[in-house]
Amino acid sequence: MHILPGHKISLQKHYQRSEHWVVINGTAFITKGKKQFKLNANQSTFIKKGEVHRIENKSKKDLIMIEVQTGEYLEEDDIKRFKDIYKR
């Protein structure tokens, strides 16, 4: 995943998949359930299916992450968006 400075993904959850995120370059600001925290390069977090989550890039440089999805259904329509600045 490549998230530009000042951008973020929608606040969302997935019903049928979990995700493991690894930061390769930059700093990610993570919302995971009710927790908010920062991840730097070489740090990771696991998002359980059904858990509300978001990634934000509040820095001035690009954020590069690897996302590994696991579950029975991995299609992009397995998503419930709560807050989406892109109006999807």
List the predicted regions and their residue ranges.
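A structural signal for the main folded, soluble domain(s) of proteins
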Residues: 2-5, 24-27, 46, 54
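Short acidic-glycine-tyrosine-enriched beta hairpin
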Residues: 32-52
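Glycine- and acidic-residue-biased ligand/ion/polar-headgroup-sensing regions
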Residues: 15-34
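Double-stranded beta-helix
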Residues: 54-88
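Conserved short histidine dyad/triad with adjacent acidic residue
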Residues: 1-16, 29
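Short, charged beta-turn/beta-strand-edge "cap" motif at the junction between a beta-strand
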Residues: 15, 51-54
